[in-house]
């Protein structure tokens, strides 16, 4: 398959972007790791698992076991998708993996179906529990009953299914790249605030220092925009489009590593300085 990918892969700019030696692609991939990690720190599903663990050792063992199982699976899936795209026979990137296994052993498909259904059920279960927890604690602060929160979560499912069908609402098209852009914006919000929130567990961090840290997270991204200004956008647009040159993800913009790094580091430094300068009374 690798030989086929090399044979079909054209020698142009897109070939450069797909090269392992091209640092732009590597930085974009690393940026996604940083962005998703920051966003997952706010996931109620993860913290529910932490709370439900028997002890620290069980939590540590479960984390390492999950990582050992997930990493090779994600690596293989991503690699096979890249190989399929390199062969040039896939018009829709979402079916690249299935293009590769089209002529494989007939036992592969049933195994993959079971795996995919299991993954979807697990993700949906975690997501729904997290939404219920967010309604109950974060949004209503315990005012809404658990039953009401569950009903509200179930009521969101038809809207989610409708949005997944790819509609166009007020001129915005809900396709894969557009939704990816929404996720990047959400990840930027998380990256700018995750350091102050987690550092609040440290007793010396004050509430005003944490608040200033959150503001500094966004200011750091804007400062990065002044140092590396986007070609066709304002310097602050990295907050909305954290991609190379602030090009929207729907137009092919690659994730910008340094926008996320500046948000995390800037917010952390401002939190520490602000906490010492403005301690809680």
Predicted features along the sequence, with ranges:
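Membrane-embedded helix-loop-helix hairpins and adjacent transmembrane boundary segments
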Residues: 1-281
